[in-house]
């Protein structure tokens, strides 16, 4: 139950998704989870294309870290509308799979019924807000970084990388050679001063580091090793989840997340996110289930990056091993 204190008469959030509203939130656990007593929160919208749909996705932030519905303590949580998902289960099934594969920091899902200013908005999926923090990507925000490769290209700190010339470019136009890369978390304007740097200086350090990883992926021979740059098990698990769910969003690319514990570490793929356009849904119900995840006609940078990764024999070998193990032990579940 969410009641806006500044607009108690509203039937829906209006304006920008980033507009924040004070609200009172409470939650009935219905015997399955602990009730959440009334408390003040900041309530706002979220999402990209889904924000413009009839059923709005939401986000709320509490004053202190709280364990909600059995999830780890955190301040911020998301309410996924699943408006284009007639099953209301695409995200839930995909994230279950990520947890089954023991992908670090995989999200959890709890179905909830949402009441907004007393109006029933229907079924939502309550989940962790992805970001650096104890409830999501639990790494040191002063040492690590969470990146997102996404054609929306709408974060404050971002750069585009040309996969063929191996250089950064000025714009993130979505084409076969360009990969739009963004800093998802933390807020560099808050972290950099504590490290004795400006936000731009800290951004440049990480931009160069991420670019070095991309260059390695694009230039290393298929028989070479990428273990110096990426955690290949995380890559394989990432592809298994997206392949089984037929999630073509990663090709565009959309919601393609990677993180690194520190500059001395390696990049890990995940947490996986956003399966609205998955399980053969591609703008219409009944799209062919055998549509290739990667083919020779891809016109987006995501295609090019994924093809380079999957051409690596080390990754392909582990992919086959983990796939066989999943078919034997996991698929029957």
PLM-predicted stretches and their roles:
Residues 1-333:
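Phosphate/dinucleotide-binding and metal-coordinating scaffold of catalytic cores
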């Amino acid at each position: 139950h969410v009641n806006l204190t500044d607009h108690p008469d509203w039937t829906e959030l209006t304006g920008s998704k980033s507009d924040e509203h004070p609200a009172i939130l409470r939650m009935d656990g219905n015997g399955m989870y602990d009730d959440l007593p009334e408390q003040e929160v900041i309530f706002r919208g979220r999402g990209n294309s889904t924000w413009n749909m009839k059923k709005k996705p939401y986000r709320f932030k509490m004053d202190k870290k709280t364990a909600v519905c059995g999830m780890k303590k955190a301040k911020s949580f998301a309410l996924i509308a699943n408006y284009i998902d007639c099953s209301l289960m695409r995200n839930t099934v995909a994230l279950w799979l990520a947890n089954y594969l023991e992908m670090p920091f995989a999200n959890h899902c709890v179905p909830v019924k949402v009441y907004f200013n007393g109006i029933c908005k229907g079924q939502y999926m309550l989940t962790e807000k992805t970001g650096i923090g104890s409830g999501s990507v639990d790494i040191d925000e002063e040492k690590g970084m969470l990146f997102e490769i996404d054609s929306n290209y709408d974060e404050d700190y971002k750069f585009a990388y040309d996969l063929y010339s191996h250089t950064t470019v000025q714009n993130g136009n979505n084409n076969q050679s360009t990969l739009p890369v963004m800093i998802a978390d933390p807020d560099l304007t808050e972290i950099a001063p504590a490290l004795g740097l400006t936000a731009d200086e800290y951004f440049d350090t990480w931009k160069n580091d991420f670019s070095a990883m991309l260059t390695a992926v694009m230039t290393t021979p298929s028989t070479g090793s990428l273990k110096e740059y990426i955690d290949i098990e995380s890559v394989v698990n990432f592809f298994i989840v997206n392949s089984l769910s037929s999630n073509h969003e990663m090709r565009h690319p959309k919601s393609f997340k990677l993180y690194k514990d520190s500059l001395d570490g390696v990049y890990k793929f995940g947490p996986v996110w956003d399966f609205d356009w998955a399980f053969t849904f591609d703008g219409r119900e009944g799209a062919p289930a055998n549509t290739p995840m990667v083919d020779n006609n891809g016109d987006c940078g995501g295609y090019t990056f994924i093809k380079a990764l999957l051409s690596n024999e080390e990754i392909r070998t582990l992919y086959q091993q983990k796939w066989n193990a999943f078919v034997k032990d996991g698929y029957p579940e």
